[in-house]
């Protein structure tokens, strides 16, 4: 069946989103055109503004419309002395929702992957090293993902921190709250046993 070139273009554009295949893209496109054109216009305007106006923070590399993000300009957070290293801006959002961290961040926008040609400078580690040498950093919290690449990246950064006399710590990995022990994979269980702590009363 021959369809509108514009409709085909819309469906193809929607497929750039993660997890969206041909059928999902078709369903979204028809929904916007048939039932929610005003929502489609708002989406188009928001996307256009976001793509043109959102850049990266000069200090931590997260997404922001300003040269420096609000977290990095917060005096209380600057005095904290902690930098939490994460792989993506989405990780910052997740950590902020816990309300348990009051320092600043550094976003790698990925992880080390020599097989893919991704080295230290590709994920901004040269800029992190500048911060370690110029700022009063007391601790770097390594919150990269618990993958082979994430662990390799964390180890590399830990060595950088040691060279600058800065404490490096790794976030704990283990059994999820509400999970059943028999369903947990061996690697996670190993991390849990290695990272056990005394029970306090």
UniProtKB/Swiss-Prot annotation:
Pfam families: RecR_C (PF21175), RecR_HhH (PF21176), RecR_ZnF (PF02132), Toprim_4 (PF13662)
GO BP: any one term: DNA repair
PROSITE patterns xrefs: TOPRIM
The UniProt record lists the keyword Zinc: yes
CDD domains listed in its UniProt record: TOPRIM_recR
Gene3D superfamilies from the UniProt entry: 3.40.1360.10, 6.10.250.240, RecR Domain 1
Entry keyword set: DNA damage, DNA recombination, DNA repair, Metal-binding, Zinc, Zinc-finger
Disulphide bridges, residue numbers: none
ZnF C4-type: positions: 57-72
Entry-linked PANTHER family: RECOMBINATION PROTEIN RECR (PTHR30446:SF0)
Family: Belongs to the RecR family.
Stated name of the protein: Recombination protein RecR
Organism: Edwardsiella ictaluri (strain 93-146)
Gene of this entry: recR
